[in-house]
């Protein structure tokens, strides 16, 4: 990764074999700690073929995928079916609101969420609580409706809003204009989930 002016390079490039080799070298320690490997991002499914190749070369390591689910169906299935657990981030129930805040609609995300229910891979749905955006009654009611309509019971975890972006923008000398009050405290109402018999908790 380079800086905005190309003046600084951060990170390293690996082949799938090189990355798997590094992870396998720590396998014993990870197993002793009852840990494993979590592929997160950004969005790890942007490199789905590489990710699938890497997972195939891991030796007896628990693999978790942290994804927003916005990927082609075949890419999502190829990776999720290789994992032991999936953290599925679901931000907004309404298609237009999703497009407004993320730049894309949620059609592929909802399709892959339903697909995940059929793969047999254990997973949890996580909703980041962005004040005034994702913590609204309308959005939480919509998400509860989506989850209650899935072909299997899935727990939901409401995550606290991460305010780290403000500092990162400042470090990059960029103006932070989130379009919402990022200093406000979210106020999620769990009753939207309990009313539909959906298990939900505050992280």
Regions found by a protein language model. Name each.
Residues 97, 113-143:
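Conserved strand-turn element in the central/C-terminal portion of the radical SAM core barrel
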Residues 1-82:
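Conserved Radical SAM active-site core
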Residues 131-203:
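Auxiliary Fe-S-binding modules of radical SAM enzymes
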Residues 51-60, 117, 148, 194:
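Surface-exposed amphipathic alpha-helices with a cationic face
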Residues 44-46, 69-76, 86-102, 129-130, ...:
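Conserved radical SAM core fold
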Residues 52, 103-108, 138-143:
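Charged helix-capping and loop-helix junction motifs
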Residues 37-39, 63-65, 86-88, 123-125, ...:
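Hydrophobic faces of well-ordered beta-strands that scaffold small-molecule active sites
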């Amino acid at each position: 990764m380079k800086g905005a002016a190309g003046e600084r390079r951060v990170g390293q490039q690996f082949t799938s074999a090189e990355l798997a080799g590094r992870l396998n070298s720590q396998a014993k320690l990870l197993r002793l700690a009852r840990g494993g490997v979590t592929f997160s991002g950004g969005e790890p499914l942007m490199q789905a073929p590489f990710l699938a190749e890497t997972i195939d070369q891991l030796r007896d390591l628990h693999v978790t995928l942290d994804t927003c689910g916005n990927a082609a169906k075949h890419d999502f299935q190829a990776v999720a079916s290789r994992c032991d657990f999936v953290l599925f981030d679901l931000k907004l129930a309404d298609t237009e609101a999703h497009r407004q805040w993320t730049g894309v609609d949620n059609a592929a995300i909802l399709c892959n969420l339903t697909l995940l229910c059929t793969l047999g891979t254990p997973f949890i749905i996580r909703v980041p609580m962005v004040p005034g955006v994702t913590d609204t009654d309308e959005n939480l009611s919509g998400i509860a409706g989506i989850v209650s309509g899935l072909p299997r019971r899935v727990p939901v975890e409401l995550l606290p809003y991460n305010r780290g972006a403000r500092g990162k923008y400042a470090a990059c000398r960029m103006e932070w204009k989130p379009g919402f009050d990022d200093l406000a405290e979210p106020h999620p109402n769990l009753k939207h989930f309990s009313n539909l018999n959906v298990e939900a908790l505050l992280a």
